[in-house]
Amino acid sequence: MYHCFRLRRGQDLYEEIEAYVKAHHIAAGAVVSGVGCVSRWRLRDATGVRVRSGEEDVEIVSLMGTVSEYGCHLHASFSREDLSAFGGHLLPGCTVTVSYT
């Protein structure tokens, strides 16, 4: 079964994905793609220790991971206006500013 949904300006990217999974009783699944922009981002590195965050308009260039009734494990990559890219483990605190149709 496939699911596709759109988020609105001001929603939290991570929390809305997690809420969708719970609301639709998805026991296990995968996020294979996501597009749009966020104005606030929050990521964790692979060690699980360092958390980085920022407030700037960045574009989602990659969004993938696993989802389940026990939680989400999502990776995101973002691109800045100068086209530099960065990414990590997606955390709550990423505010959607633009979503595409």
Task: Give the label of every model feature segment.
Residues 8, 32-34, 63, 85-86:
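Short glycine/serine/threonine-biased micro-segments
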Residues 101:
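Conserved small/polar residues in nucleotide/adenosyl-binding loops
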Residues 15, 19-27, 80-84, 91-92, ...:
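Short, intrinsically disordered, mixed-charge
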Residues 1-9:
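Short amphipathic
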Residues 12-54:
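Short, well-structured hydrophobic secondary-structure segments
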Residues 52-94:
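Mid-chain, well-packed structural core segment of small domains
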